[in-house]
């Protein structure tokens, strides 16, 4: 089997990498593995959790079947046998635990109330700041509007004054033309 084929099969079977333990059972008695021309010798490693069966060997490659063995629980000690038996708690211990639980509950309540008070205070500050900003905006808008109205009033008055001046000049000019015309008519008689 080539190394590339073996690696490819191992990629296809990710669980095999979890269950396979390729360690030497007795490193002193077993000869060391020799790497030869991109091949893997499956007899070199001891695989305790799986079995590899060669199915077909031909020039184009090799096929094999990997059979995972079920886990065995031989030699595993029972948990109950190793654990010491729990003794019943005394009335004083129960009372102490209840008092400690009550203190924890009160502390948690106090922390929650403190947190809520801080949150409310922060909300009040945010609302107060928003009101102040709104009032400042209204004040600035009123000032701008008053300035604009004053400017418009001044421009209008200046425009009216200029129009009146032009009308007065036209009236003067018309009066002069009339006088000149009357003088010419009297002179021509």
Swiss-Prot record:
<dbReference type="InterPro" id="IPR000956">
    <property type="entry name" value="Stathmin_fam"/>
</dbReference>
<dbReference type="GO" id="GO:0031175">
    <property type="term" value="P:neuron projection development"/>
</dbReference>
<dbReference type="InterPro" id="IPR036002">
    <property type="entry name" value="Stathmin_sf"/>
</dbReference>
<feature type="lipid moiety-binding region" description="S-palmitoyl cysteine">
    <location>
        <position position="22"/>
    </location>
</feature>
<feature type="modified residue" description="Phosphoserine">
    <location>
        <position position="90"/>
    </location>
</feature>
<feature type="domain" description="SLD">
    <location>
        <begin position="48"/>
        <end position="189"/>
    </location>
</feature>
<dbReference type="GO" id="GO:0030426">
    <property type="term" value="C:growth cone"/>
</dbReference>
<dbReference type="GO" id="GO:0007019">
    <property type="term" value="P:microtubule depolymerization"/>
</dbReference>
<dbReference type="GO" id="GO:0031110">
    <property type="term" value="P:regulation of microtubule polymerization or depolymerization"/>
</dbReference>
<dbReference type="InterPro" id="IPR030514">
    <property type="entry name" value="Stathmin_CS"/>
</dbReference>
<dbReference type="GO" id="GO:0005737">
    <property type="term" value="C:cytoplasm"/>
</dbReference>
<keyword id="KW-0564">Palmitate</keyword>
<feature type="region of interest" description="Disordered">
    <location>
        <begin position="168"/>
        <end position="189"/>
    </location>
</feature>
<comment type="function">
    <text>Exhibits microtubule-destabilizing activity.</text>
</comment>
<dbReference type="GO" id="GO:0043005">
    <property type="term" value="C:neuron projection"/>
</dbReference>
<dbReference type="Pfam" id="PF00836">
    <property type="entry name" value="Stathmin"/>
</dbReference>
<dbReference type="GO" id="GO:0005794">
    <property type="term" value="C:Golgi apparatus"/>
</dbReference>
<keyword id="KW-0966">Cell projection</keyword>
<keyword id="KW-0175">Coiled coil</keyword>
<dbReference type="GO" id="GO:0015631">
    <property type="term" value="F:tubulin binding"/>
</dbReference>
<keyword id="KW-0333">Golgi apparatus</keyword>
<comment type="similarity">
    <text>Belongs to the stathmin family.</text>
</comment>
<keyword id="KW-0597">Phosphoprotein</keyword>
<feature type="coiled-coil region">
    <location>
        <begin position="90"/>
        <end position="189"/>
    </location>
</feature>
<protein>
    <recommendedName>
        <fullName>Stathmin-4</fullName>
    </recommendedName>
</protein>
<keyword id="KW-0449">Lipoprotein</keyword>
<feature type="lipid moiety-binding region" description="S-palmitoyl cysteine">
    <location>
        <position position="20"/>
    </location>
</feature>
